[in-house]
From Swiss-Prot:
Organism annotation: Paraburkholderia phytofirmans (strain DSM 17436 / LMG 22146 / PsJN)
Cofactor-binding details, from the entry: May bind 1 zinc ion per subunit.
Function per UniProt: Part of the Sec protein translocase complex. Interacts with the SecYEG preprotein conducting channel. Has a central role in coupling the hydrolysis of ATP to the transfer of proteins into and across the cell membrane, serving both as a receptor for the preprotein-SecB complex and as an ATP-driven molecular motor driving the stepwise translocation of polypeptide chains across the membrane.
NCBIfam families: PRK12904.1, secA
Domain of life: Bacteria
Protein name per UniProt: Protein translocase subunit SecA
Amino acid sequence: MTTGFLQKIFGSRNQRLVKQYQKTVTAINALEPQIEQLTDDQLRAKTGEFRQRVASGESLDKLLPEAFAVCREASKRVLKMRHFDVQLIGGMVLHYGKIGEMRTGEGKTLVATLPVYLNALSGRGVHVVTVNDYLAQRDAEWMARLYNFLGLSVGINLSQMDHGAKQEAYAADITYGTNNEFGFDYLRDNMVYETDARVQRALNFAVVDEVDSILIDEARTPLIISGQAEDHTDLYVRMNALPPLLERQIGEEKADGTGVERPGDYTLDEKGRQVFLTESGHEKAERLLAEWGLIGEGESLYAPQNITLMHHVYAALRAHTLFFKDQHYVVQNGEVVIVDEFTGRLMSGRRWSDGLHQAVEAKEHVKIQSENQTLASITFQNYFRMYAKLSGMTGTADTEAFEFNEIYGLETVVIPTNRPPKRIDKQDQIYKTAKERYDAVIRDIRDCYERGQPVLVGTTSIENSELLSHLLKQAGLPHEVLNAKQHAREAEIVAEAGRPKRVTIATNMAGRGTDIVLGGNAEKQASFIEKDETLSEEEKQRRIQKLHDEWQALHDQVKAAGGLHIIGTERHESRRIDNQLRGRAGRQGDPGSSRFYLSLEDPLLRIFAGDRVRAIMDRLKMPEGEAIEAGIVSRSIESAQRKVEARNFDVRKQLLEYDDVSNDQRKVIYQQRNELLEANDITETIGAMRQSVIGEIVHQFVPVGSIEEQWDVPELEEVLRNEWQLDLAIQEMINESNSISADEILEAVEAAADEAYEAKVELVGRESFSAFERSIMLQTLDRSWREHLAALDHLRQGIHLRGYAQKNPKQEYKREAFELFAAMLDAVKLEVTRVVMNVQIQSPEQLEQAAEQLEEQGGHLENVEFRHAEFAEAAAAAPVAAEAATAAMIGDAMSHGSSHTAAANLSADNVPKVGRNDPCPCGSGKKYKQCHGKIV
């Protein structure tokens, strides 16, 4: 109450910020008459002047009014577009490292030019991030005219570009590209063997378009570079026979033993999208696997030798019970292709990990491709947090403002529209069954069609879009379908969706980034006329004018009919996705309307709000075909969406906490790699490693502080001779000396090792040997890091079991991941020292040959797969709820400087005790007493 009262007096934080930026807008507008007087050359020269001032120490913030005024004037001259005042505010929001929410059609692409121009003046590079190659290329080509006019260079970073082209793109002042490609380039740069093979510069400033899609929807799963691992094809085929033999249990057993309606072998958690084997399910699976000869008679699935089988059992179960054809994937040309659950697009070339994709291939009886081993991985959360300054823009960010602030430290500012919006959002209509809902949708579409009003219908899956298409065909209503299967025609369909009588069915919001203009997209058709070389200039102008006149008539006709009408056939889990669909109507002050048609059979209503709404319908005695249209029901649905959003936020936050473990480790490894690549001589590093390894070996047989009788000298001599090529008569030294200490023996062995090393260096030369050492070091570090990623993956898959022992799984994961990391670094030291001490080389030529062979073994970028797994993978990658919270993630240990402290703080004594009514540590969301507390 007090907050509301204070807001009335002082305004909200958003209003205060906009008011503050309005003062700067006034200053920019005051400069306009003066800037307009400049010639093109004088305007272009301003860029050089600004760069000089930045180099002299002037801040970009101080330069902002002048730079924005220059950019606006250049845009007027080159693009024939003048930035509105609200667009200047948007530019400031982005420059100050915030997220700007701008309505559809408000010109986000043009807004970005202001902060991009200003920040490019520093010479440190600006990245403009889009969701696909088409938008990156379109925006770069469109805006390059403006930037080139102002003397700035523009690069486009696309997939499949060669190495030289990528280096050129990153060297430009401004680089356009996709989120995936920027992330993969970062990973690839940290897998190279030469400094000049890297493409990226330091990460300075990024403007992320459709920031909600990239930083939230896609943040739950990592970018992965992987190579082929061991082949288990036959096992997937055999495991595919298991799920049909198991029965689903209906109901969940309560503490008093009740709650199970029908006993079975596994349970499904639809909210968490997880599958669990029951006690009887474990027994049945073990019996069947024993019959098939996959495990020994009477053996448990949890026996150490059967752990990999457990992984295959759950992969097969998830494939059969949680993933369905034409909803989560399609089968095309004998391959299983993932469908993006957010956009409905086909994700060709991407594969689910953890064996899930192979299990789905076995289920669909298509060729099973080999499993992959992770070579490098990073999440968008951790990649984008590395930029010195990050900003973003979208049409729908306000509902996720808390998450942007919590995870990325980014404030969201809602930017006012240039013209007041005229879209009418009608009340939801809820029907008892899906059939009644679709009947109502067809009636609404027919009404719009007869009045000449264009309609965009949003569906949540390919299956639903094709069902609706079938119903429209039966009703005799012409329409276009825009889903993953029609990907190639996407831009064409979206561009024409605003024509009179046009009915377009779209899966989720495929086609984001392309405006739906009322009356159709005349500019697109005009561009075809412009490119037609058979026409004269006069004929081109005549045809374009005629086209514009026709478009204007259609535009007025559609406006008179009410503008674009949006129909939602289902509510999405997130209010933001619903708002994106609504936002396609009413652009730039045009009229428009939207309405959602729902049924009690929709997953969201069935799982979260169905009982409450059904009770209201029963109480009102609603006849068949009648809809309920009430604010209380819509609020109930919004409440359900908020619950799902909160749950998804918790999942993402928990994933980030796990990923923060491997992120710090990744930084340490990549920093060491970069130091190795940039160092002229690594003799000191190799020497320190040799000293450490030799010390450990000697102390193993001659412990510090021990007496001579406790020493195992013959064994030490044998190990040094056989494993380290050091032939030392240590026993003779002891016999000849009256008294000799363990430290003196260590010094003697170190001296012999140094002498053997120097002899090798002298033989082939310091420079050649140093290059060889660098190759060994990089190759060993990369191989050990890959194995470490796999070890972390296995660790997180079983870490939820620590909850049974009343230990905090997250803390246990951090502690053990740190121990694994320390062990990995020790293994690297040992392996590198072993190779250097054992290598037998007679000439520099032999040394070069050995280095080349090592680099060939490490040249894993030639036969690898680059993919960004979708959320379906993250949700499915773990057989239990806690695993869902860490799925498709590789964790993150302690920061380099404080690892000892962190490890000390992670002892089991510091793990909080779980109370009976506390949430279960496994992450299921249930109370401990109703989850793992029952078992304990």
